[in-house]
Amino acid sequence: MKNFIDLTEDLDLHKLVQEAQALKKEPCVHEALGKRKVLGLLFFNPSLRTRLSTQKAAKLLGMEVMVMNFSSEAWAIEYEDGTVMSGLRSEHIREAAQVVSQYCDIVAIRAFASLTDQEKDESEIVLRSFQKYASVPIVNMESATAHPLQAVADAITLKEHWPSHKPKIVLSWAPHPKALPHAVANSFVKMMASQEADFVITHPKGYELDEKITKG
């Protein structure tokens, strides 16, 4: 698996959880694995837990970490081909992704949905464009439609607290000061598809997830 964009059917989640649990017991066992390697963290949106945990994971693997906040520290990027670069966007994704690839061995990206254009959000233009033009592996630290790192962390938590009987797990919504995309919920649903549990989604009317995610 070169890229980690979303939870896919070919991902052995149970094996991944087992490896993660082993690393929790011996966090420095692979500290030479990332020696002389650089992880680039590109943030188009704020982050607390994902940023700190990803940086900590890289350090435990012996990697160096470079962080860039694109919202305040970089030129605005143009993602459309054939666009005349005479407006507010000074950098094209073709060149930007190649530059980042020269300095980083792995690139992790956080880019939320705009919540203004559903079709454009679902196209995952930021993540998919970097995946297309970068020459190094891409990791999703939360995008418009998915948060696979969070889903893996949730799977680890469930494993650690799993009862002896088949549990009932409920996914529901809670109030938040800001409108949020479905990324976390989408990935949680995909993660639960591989769990032996009575899984229920409950929510106010009008706040449904995409049927393409929940139909399974």
Which residue ranges define each predicted feature?
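Exposed alpha-helical structural elements
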Residues: 12-15, 129, 212
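Generic structural signal for well-ordered alpha-helical scaffold segments
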Residues: 21-25, 155-159, 189
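Phosphate/diphosphate ligand-binding glycine-rich loop within oxidoreductases
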Residues: 34-40, 48-159
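Glycine-rich phosphate/diphosphate-binding loop of Rossmann-like nucleotide-binding domains
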Residues: 44-66, 159-216
